[in-house]
Structures are given as C-alpha cells and as structure tokens.
C-alpha cells in the first residue's frame, strides 16, 4: 500500500484483529469494519450496511477486495454505492471442498461476487479455469496477473546461505508451503505426499 499511496489516496478497510497494528503502519488511512469469516447472515448484513455507508461517504473510484467474505460484501456494497471500478482478487475458493447445502450457498455467493465486480483476478490460471468451467464467472472479466505471481520474488532478499544452516545441499529439491495449517488448504494431502516422496527420493526436503 505504501507504493500505491504515492500515486493514489488509499483507504484500507479491514476488521480489527491480527495484523491490524501492522496495517496502520502503512501509508494509508485505515478504517475498521467488523467482519466474520463464517456464514452469519445477520452479522453480514450489518457489515454490508456499514460498507455501503462508507463507500457513499468516501466516493472511491476503485474498490479492490480480497478473500471470499470480504469479496462478497465489498463487491456488493461497491455495486450498491455505484463505485465505477470494482476489482476482486480470488485468493481463496472454499467452494471446491464444500458439500451439500453449504456448497450451494457458496456457489451463489461466489457468482454474486463476480457479477458485482467489474474485474476479477484469479491468483492462478488453474483457478481461472475452474471458475470458468463451473460457469460462475464471466471469462471476459477474468485476468491472471503475472501467471499468478503479481509481486514477483526479490532474489536479492532471499539468500541461499540459509540453506546451509539446515543442511540442505545444492542438489536437494526443496518444497515450500505458504498458507494456513487448515484441512481446506490441503495440508493433510501435502504432508502425506511429502512422507511418500521422501521414501523414494532421499534428496527431497
């Protein structure tokens, strides 16, 4: 946000909690809004009303949302408030692991999110393909930025010297995982795969 603040008037809207103090260190005006990760119709309606009220007051040119819940409420509120550019980045897709009535609800909410957005940015080509194949998003709105790695990697920042401390050689193949340690992120399958691979390939870490 520090980068964008050099060119735009940036407002960060998020619930208070973990990471809030770090958010306030950014060069942006921070406005707290209560938001629940879980499906909670009454609480979500209150949040939606707060966002609509905020967008009408601030009159932003662009609203950019992340995560399923923030995307649903943010894009719907921006559409109601007639914000001209409504951008949603798809960084989570719980629909793929949900079942029964929950899956139907999530399918509807995802479809509504993409319908309210003017631009949708899946974080990988695979994610884009899934969304389009399920028929819940308009392919004309979809764009995968930088093959899913829009920020890139600063190779000068990450040093290979750290691998020596944990005894990883140049010839070892190392896997990494970034995400919440949660079954919906596929952590169980990932650990099972690591165990299986290590039995056959000793140079995998």
Predicted features by range, described:
Residues 62, 78-93, 110, 121:
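Active-site proximal beta-strand in glycosyltransferases
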Residues 65-71:
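Short His-centered aromatic/hydrophobic patch
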């Amino acid at each position: 946000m520090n980068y964008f603040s050099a060119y735009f008037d940036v407002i960060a809207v998020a619930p208070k909690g973990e990471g809030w103090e770090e958010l306030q260190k950014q060069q942006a005006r921070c406005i707290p809004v209560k938001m629940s990760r879980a499906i909670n119709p009454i609480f979500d309606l209150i949040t939606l009303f707060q966002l609509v009220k905020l967008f009408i007051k601030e009159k932003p040119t662009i609203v950019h949302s992340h995560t399923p819940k923030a995307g649903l409420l943010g894009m719907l509120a921006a559409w109601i408030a007639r914000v001209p550019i409504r951008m949603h980045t798809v960084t989570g897709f719980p629909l793929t692991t949900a079942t029964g009535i929950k899956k139907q609800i999530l399918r509807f909410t995802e479809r509504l999110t993409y319908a309210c957005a003017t631009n949708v940015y899946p974080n990988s080509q695979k994610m884009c393909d899934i969304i389009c194949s399920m028929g819940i998003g308009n392919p004309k709105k979809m764009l995968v930025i930088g093959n899913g790695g829009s920020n890139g990697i600063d190779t000068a920042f990450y040093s290979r010297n750290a691998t020596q401390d944990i005894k990883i050689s140049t010839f070892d193949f190392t896997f990494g995982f970034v995400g919440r340690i949660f079954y919906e992120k596929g952590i169980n399958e990932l650990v099972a795969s690591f165990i299986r691979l290590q039995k056959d390939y000793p140079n995998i870490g």
